[in-house]
A protein has these predicted regions:
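Long, positively charged, glycine-interspersed low-complexity recognition regions
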Residues: 23, 227-299
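Interfacial aromatic-anchored transmembrane helix boundaries in multi-pass membrane proteins
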Residues: 29-38, 68-97
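Central hydrophobic cores of alpha-helical transmembrane segments
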Residues: 62-72, 108-118, 243-255
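Small-residue-rich helix-loop
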Residues: 200-201, 212-231, 240
């Protein structure tokens, strides 16, 4: 049975899911004896789940999910960690596999899977704290020596979002790097940048809005705005339009000037929210570029 090939029979599906679950089990056992290896499992689990979701029929995925969760619990005897780390990774891996099958652009795949992974992790925090009788977030921050950080409460959601981004990003990177070898077609065609510009402006608006009453989510949406901005910046760099380069340079100088003047006038940690002007400027330039120049590209 070819490892990276669509499965056609029930036996193939069960065998394939068993192989992937066994690979997960190996990492689980290693992580049990060497706890730092748990992070390798956390990073690789979405990839294994994505491969299963892509090559197997979706109705059989629940078998793989239940088997993986069960093995994690039986080997670690920690239902809290299993719910907090493993379940979101399995769910986001399934979504990534479906999006791959639908030939969605990697940008949207990464964003969708990250949001789902992070949202499930957020949602499970109260349940995990209740089951384990410990503060799972504080335990996670302690691993990175951030337990005494002054603004740790404001950074918790952003921290989880970035971990989810790393998880899903690694899975997508591996898939894109070996796409031809494993028989997966990646869609990199972009016919319009307007959805990206709209997404950027929406994330900026949400970041500014939440900053008024709930800073943790404001920082998450600030991070999302930088995600959109980084993608649009690549397009601006490859536009090879002198007017765009000049406009970008002028805006960069203006942003640095504005940031330097107003940053200290804002109370910590709200000063960081002022960095929203960076993605905002990129959005403005991208907006003008897409009005003046229209062409489909591959990114």
């Amino acid at each position: 049975m070819a490892l990276f090939k669509k499965k056609t029979t029930l036996v193939h599906h069960i065998t394939y899911m068993g192989i992937m679950a066994a690979i997960n089990l190996i990492f689980i056992l290693l992580a049990t004896f060497v706890p730092p290896l748990m992070f390798i499992l956390i990073l690789l689990l979405p990839f294994a789940s994505t491969v299963v979701a892509y090559y197997c029929l979706k109705r059989y995925y629940i078998i793989y999910a239940v088997a993986t969760v069960g093995l994690c619990f039986l080997c670690s005897f920690n239902i809290g960690d299993t719910i907090f780390y493993v379940v979101p990774a399995i769910a986001s891996g399934f979504v990534l596999g479906v999006l791959l099958e639908q030939k969605i652009h990697p940008f949207w795949m990464l964003l969708s899977c990250t949001v789902i992974n992070a949202a499930l992790t957020y949602a499970f925090i109260p349940l995990v704290n209740l089951i384990s009788k410990t503060d799972i977030v504080l335990s996670l921050l302690t691993i990175f020596n951030l337990q005494d950080f002054l603004y740790k409460t404001e950074l918790v959601y952003l921290f989880i979002f970035l971990i989810s981004l790393a998880q899903c990003g690694l899975s997508i990177f591996i898939i894109i790097s070996d796409a031809k070898k494993i028989g997966i077609q990646i869609n990199t065609r972009i016919n319009s940048f307007w959805p990206y510009i709209i997404g950027l402006e929406a994330s900026i608006a949400l970041s500014v809005g939440f900053a008024l009453f709930y800073m943790p989510l404001a920082l998450v949406f600030l991070c999302v705005s930088f995600y959109f901005a980084a993608f649009l910046l690549v397009d601006l760099i490859f536009s090879k339009k002198l007017l765009i380069y000049i406009l970008s340079g002028v805006l960069v100088l203006a942003i640095i000037f504005v940031f330097a003047i107003f940053y200290k006038s804002l109370k910590e940690p709200y000063g960081i929210e002022l960095s929203v002007i960076f993605p905002l400027a990129i959005g403005v330039v991208s907006f003008l570029k897409n009005i003046l120049f229209k062409y489909p590209v591959n990114i």
